[in-house]
From Swiss-Prot:
Mutation effect (residue 31 to G): Slight decrease in DNA protection and significant decrease in iron affinity. Retains only one third of wild-type DNA protection and loses iron binding ability
Name of the protein described by the UniProt record: DNA protection during starvation protein
PROSITE patterns linked to this entry: DPS_1, DPS_2
GO CC aspect terms: cytoplasm
Species name: Listeria innocua serovar 6a (strain ATCC BAA-680 / CLIP 11262)
Cellular location(s): Cytoplasm
CDD domains from the UniProt entry: DPS (cd01043)
Gene: dps
Amino acid sequence: MKTINSVDTKEFLNHQVANLNVFTVKIHQIHWYMRGHNFFTLHEKMDDLYSEFGEQMDEVAERLLAIGGSPFSTLKEFLENASVEEAPYTKPKTMDQLMEDLVGTLELLRDEYKQGIELTDKEGDDVTNDMLIAFKASIDKHIWMFKAFLGKAPLE
């Protein structure tokens, strides 16, 4: 019989709580510091992303609570446990540079979600698995759209 809601799943979800918290700060940073062509369109898009990934973070934390885990809840814990890294804004960046950084973080999340999908499938945790599949599908679409903005193919 498969083990459902194992320590591995709880650790994975908690890692994503940390990642998503750091990522939402990065999105805000892009939102505040962007300049140049497509400002109005991308500024609004960052609002949408901030909301979407804030909701993802909340869903992941609530799923973790539902399976008996304890989500990280301090800035120190987020920074110590995230693979998404802070990106201090020390000098102006072009819109393309900001979008490249955003895509890089989305790709990191996509790859980690893929690992989580495999883990939860192996463990038979269908609820967490379905949640991660839906989140990964959204991330895949964002990667495609931002790469198109940058004039790149989705798998480039």
